[in-house]
Amino acid sequence: MSAARQPSPTVRDKAAPEPAAPAAPKGARAPRARRAAPPHGVRPAPALAAEERARLLEGRHHDPHAVLGARTQRGGVAFRVLRPYAKAVTVVAKGLRTELVDEGDGLFSGLLPLTGVPDYRLLVTYDSDEIEVHDPYRFLPALGELDLHLIGEGRHEELWTALGSQPMEHQGVAGTRFTVWAPNALGVRVTGDFSYWDAVAYPMRSLGASGVWELFLPGVAEGALYKYEITRPDGGRTLRADPMARYAEVPPANASIVTASRYEWQDAEWMARRGALAPHQAPMSVYELHLASWRPGLSYRQLAEQLPAYVKELGFTHVELMPVAEHPFGGSWGYQVTGFYAPTSRMGTPDDFRFLVDALHRAGIGVIVDWVPAHFPRDDWALAEFDGRPLYEHQDPRRAAHPDWGTLEFDYGRKEVRNFLVANAVYWCQEFHVDGLRADAVASMLYLDYSRDEGDWSPNAHGGREDLDAVALLQEMNATVYRRFPGVVTIAEESTAWDGVTRPTDSGGLGFGLKWNMGWMHDTLRYVSKEPVHRKYHHHDMTFGMVYAFSENFVLPISHDEVVHGKRSLVSKMPGDWWQQRATHRAYLGFMWAHPGKQLLFMGQEFAQGSEWSETYGPDWWVLDSSYPAAGDHLGVRSLVRDLNRTYTASPALWERDSVPEGFAWVEADAADDNVFAFLRFARDGSPLLCVSNFSPVVRHGYRIGVPQEVGQWREVLNTDLEPYGGSGVHHARALRPEPVPAQGRAVSLRMTLPPMATVWLRP
């Protein structure tokens, strides 16, 4: 029932509800301390003690509801209102209209001869305006005891529903509940455009030992800008964005925005079937991109018109989005997050981002987002020393400071911080239907001595260098995500030999579904960057990955990190002239797509962009324009990537047994002088696929490749040297039949012509 339709107020002996957000006029001066003569027939309420009055006005009061609002006492009902800049405040109820006494400093009070607290509103008069509002200090807490209990335990898996700003109806009145965790604060006030950014009027109440502060503001609706003014333990004040904000201003502005989702998802079919296969037993080829620079200037909704069609045409099964959580500095590419619960507003609203994810799902494309639990920046309006003391960061400065990036590391041992991060992972999966989370910089979390000199770190309780708190966090996050969201995959960017990254948590592992194989990437790129004549001395770089290929469930990443900061683009790493560079680029991708592990390729590399990636300008799309003389060269590489993905997806041998030794067998691993590699992949039913790579610039005629005796013929299903891809066209037009000539330890072999700098796939 709305306030306007409520029956006549009954007498109460407790404060009731009904608030509304006042607004001080622009340009108003700070209120003067004055005590006006009381209106006719109105007695002032009993005066506040000097210390309590000071705490209220200075933002140090832990329970403003105890002194503001209305309550019964001897002689009637005492009203007290804090309205800076107001000329007068009048209590309005059915049969009642009484102006309160001006106590000075924006305080107004009155003791009215009533037997109970009525359902009242406040008529607030300013120099040039008069508004009628509900009193925020008549309301009971809008956060339940169960929420507080779960927050206190560090087990609130849907933390974003309890903390932050929540538009809602409370006690029959529409408004917004503001809640923030700030256990060290002497006081917290909420301010925003609804108060002309004056915080004095809206002190929040402390909800006991939880460390949570709460205030329900009637009349504050979606779209309102806000921040919290926190009084630190030293008495100073700091103005902060909401750590739980689900929407924020476009940087460099940094206020939080009240929001609620009304998006109606259209991806039910996708969500129902995405968990049919375990990710490591399903095809997965990932197109990594930076949303803001893929097509610079596009909004989320404009991206939804172009990105799904492009990715689907190329045959990728997933996209991986570099961090979309809000971040102040675009040059960080999103890896220095300040708004962990807010998709960046640079490209639109949270619902606009939902629209993009939905469009990708409807195109049959999974969505992985980069998630950054390792650190956060030091901006003084964000998380750093949020309530005046280390809160989200570790109390030990040596543990808090990230030595590589000048940022701060989370205190993984604090239950509320752990809850903040675990719930954040749940949030992206639940609220945005993402299909995977790639945890960034996991290695920096796992080791106490990561990038630290001796004396700059202290060992764990067992004397070791492992960060046991970080281990516990990652295990809890993975266990929670996999329990709640079947079909979602978590991926670790972990660059060390930590044992059990993708082992289940109940077996002592970290519990990730997949791990980036950084070692494979570095080794193989080192090989292909050498001149062909020198590659024989580095042959092991291409084979060593198989020594540990099944120790974890791997992703083979050619990511953004490999095409920036002087590392050159993928094609530019290759030696030789332009033809040789493209040929080696294509051969490498063919080798990579057939190798055990999932594939990841960063944007621009699918068409052999020659320059490094720029977050400002994005991929060099112009090289695909027909007016560019070499456009055909780049289009040829893109056509190859399309056919790699399509053939890969149609070949269960390449993904059904990706993480078990039975799915792979070397055929030729020792032909260092020839720069040749050959291996077999096997599907669950035993059907094979043969991959042969020749990384030398010469055609090798009559080359013997041993094959299984039971297969009667082999046909070429992919060849990176075909002319449409920009190759020389050396291929096998007809099926090849094994001959009874032993090779590589097998009784029969194929007599092949190996194209130069190329990879060939054959199937029965």
Swiss-Prot record:
Belongs to the glycosyl hydrolase 13 family. GlgB subfamily. Residues 17-28 have a biased composition (Low complexity). Its EC number is 2.4.1.18. InterPro entries: A-amylase/branching_C, Branching_enzy, GlgB, GlgB_N, GlgB_N_E_set_prok, Glyco_hydro_13_cat_dom, Glyco_hydro_13_N, Glyco_hydro_b. Pathway: Glycan biosynthesis; glycogen biosynthesis. The keyword Glycosyltransferase applies. Monomer. One of its GO terms (biological process) is glycogen biosynthetic process. It catalyses: Transfers a segment of a (1->4)-alpha-D-glucan chain to a primary hydroxy group in a similar glucan chain. GO terms for cellular component: cytosol. One of its GO terms (molecular function) is 1,4-alpha-glucan branching enzyme activity. This is 1,4-alpha-glucan branching enzyme GlgB. Keywords: Carbohydrate metabolism, Glycogen biosynthesis, Glycogen metabolism, Glycosyltransferase, Transferase. Residues 1-46 are annotated as: Disordered. The active site is at residues 440, 493. Catalyzes the formation of the alpha-1,6-glucosidic linkages in glycogen by scission of a 1,4-alpha-linked oligosaccharide from growing alpha-1,4-glucan chains and the subsequent attachment of the oligosaccharide to the alpha-1,6 position.
